[in-house]
């Protein structure tokens, strides 16, 4: 019975870690809520959408004056003649393994024991070093591997 409970707990925990890390990745790839757009800015682009015309009453085709009957017009905005901005694009949210606290790791989706182990083994010289921490479960290591692109190991400033 206890073994069954342990297996279920491990499954739920790994699902929570994966869900938390997936949520963090999605939050980073989402456009900012401010909704501001600057010409040439590719961080807040909205993918083009198309609408299917809805038939009128009794299956008649929609009239051209109907908002659903007008064919979709592609945007013909001319390309900007100015050079792209020289300021770097805002970077996605990253996690500095040498500055992160266990509470921040828990909020990112890790379980508390794994988060404490990661914090106790600081400093790291490169992000891959976190995978060598003794005591991390395979599920936690898999979640960390899947999110290696957002992990950093910046040297601690004194």
Curated annotation (Swiss-Prot):
Residues 66-94 have a biased composition (Low complexity). Residues 1-27 form the signal peptide. Coiled coil: none annotated. Residues 27-46 have a biased composition (Polar residues). One of its GO terms (cellular component) is plasma membrane. Disulfide bonds: none annotated. SUPFAM superfamilies: PsbU/PolX domain-like (SSF81585). Residues 27-94 are annotated as: Disordered. Residues 54-65 have a biased composition (Pro residues). One of its GO terms (biological process) is photosynthesis. It is found in: Cell inner membrane. It is a peripheral membrane protein. Keywords: Cell inner membrane, Cell membrane, Electron transport, Membrane, Photosynthesis, Photosystem II, Signal, Transport. The keyword Nucleus does not apply. PSII is composed of 1 copy each of membrane proteins PsbA, PsbB, PsbC, PsbD, PsbE, PsbF, PsbH, PsbI, PsbJ, PsbK, PsbL, PsbM, PsbT, PsbX, Psb30/Ycf12, peripheral proteins PsbO, CyanoQ (PsbQ), PsbU, PsbV and a large number of cofactors. It forms dimeric complexes. One of the extrinsic, lumenal subunits of photosystem II (PSII). PSII is a light-driven water plastoquinone oxidoreductase, using light energy to abstract electrons from H(2)O, generating a proton gradient subsequently used for ATP formation. The extrinsic proteins stabilize the structure of photosystem II oxygen-evolving complex (OEC), the ion environment of oxygen evolution and protect the OEC against heat-induced inactivation. Belongs to the PsbU family. This is Photosystem II extrinsic protein U. It comes from Gloeobacter violaceus (strain ATCC 29082 / PCC 7421). The gene is psbU.
